[in-house]
């Protein structure tokens, strides 16, 4: 019995030692991976700040200067406050700058062109009241890293080129897709619209017994769309739902008054459809038109012109006959 106990004790000790060795190996591997990652990104601090302290990013890319202001996590374009920004793209810039390290520090060589005479990208970041300006030149032909200089520092540095990719956007590239209509398809209670032909169509949602159910309880009811004042004509509910989804859909671009939004140039002198959408919050007018460069939307109370896909226009310009069930 004693021999058996000693054997078990030895096995337990061996297992404990192996477990400790495995833990140490995993920890060492994690440390090596972290060190390798840090080495790849660089270890020479160029720009460092808490993301909570950031207030402004100004960058010039290919000659266009954009100034992004951060107010309590909401981004605004200083040059055009009406413009809807891609919040994710702005936050990616913050992440790239908040811990930007250089991989190498070099001495500039006479006669060498580092791309600073006409830099593709210049970034100025303001955080905690401190301003840092970085000028990015050309890429090293061997390593692919980009040359960078920091204002107030005569040294030349290189950074991983991937850290600057998030700034390769002009104004249009920073647009954040959203729904300017401001409602969901499920919120809509009534739709009334006039087509370019002059045809007027009015739709209203009602609650009806689902299928052949004859139980008068809420579980057997469903929302059914019909022509206003016409309870007998069946509509193609899928086409109606496509229309509701189109009315509440995201837009793909924006032309603000600051950009010279011109309704006439975008076809709003002869709109394809003028749609009044009623929800619990009230009635809003959406106008759709077609210009030489595509299809557009304007929303009541908003002076911007929004680019929409052609399929959206098709869905919201259906005639009464097209909506009637076969």
Give names to the regions the model predicted.
Residues 1-326:
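Soluble, acidic/polar mature domains that operate outside membranes
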């Amino acid at each position: 019995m004693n021999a058996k106990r000693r054997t078990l004790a030895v096995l337990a000790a061996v297992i404990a030692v192996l477990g400790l060795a495995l833990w140490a190996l995993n920890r060492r591997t994690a440390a090596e991976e972290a060190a390798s990652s840090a080495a790849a990104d660089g270890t020479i601090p160029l720009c460092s700040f808490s993301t909570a302290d950031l207030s402004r990013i100004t960058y010039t890319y290919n000659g266009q200067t954009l100034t992004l202001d951060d107010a309590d996590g909401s981004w605004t374009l200083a040059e055009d406050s009406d413009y809807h920004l891609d919040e994710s793209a702005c936050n990616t810039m913050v992440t790239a700058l908040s811990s930007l390290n250089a991989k190498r520090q070099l001495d500039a060589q006479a006669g060498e062109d580092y791309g600073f005479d006409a830099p593709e990208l210049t970034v100025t970041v303001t955080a905690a009241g401190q301003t840092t300006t970085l000028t990015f030149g050309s890429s090293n032909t061997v390593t692919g890293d980009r040359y960078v200089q920091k204002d107030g520092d005569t040294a030349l540095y290189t950074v991983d080129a991937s850290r600057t990719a998030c700034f390769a956007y002009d104004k249009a590239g920073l647009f954040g897709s959203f729904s300017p209509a401001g409602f969901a398809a499920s919120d809509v209670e009534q739709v009334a619209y006039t087509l370019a032909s002059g045809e007027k169509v009015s739709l209203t949602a009602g609650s009806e017994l689902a299928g052949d159910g004859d139980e008068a309880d809420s579980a057997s009811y469903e929302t059914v769309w019909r022509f206003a004042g016409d309870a007998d004509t069946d509509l193609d509910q899928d086409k109606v739902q496509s229309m509701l989804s189109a009315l509440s859909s995201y837009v793909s671009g924006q032309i603000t008054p600051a950009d010279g939004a011109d309704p006439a140039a975008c076809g709003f002198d002869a709109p394809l459809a003028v749609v009044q959408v009623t929800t619990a919050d009230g009635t809003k007018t959406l106008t759709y038109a077609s210009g030489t460069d595509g299809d557009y939307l304007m929303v009541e109370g908003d002076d911007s012109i929004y680019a929409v896909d052609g399929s959206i226009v098709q869905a919201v310009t259906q005639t009464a006959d097209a909506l009637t069930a076969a």
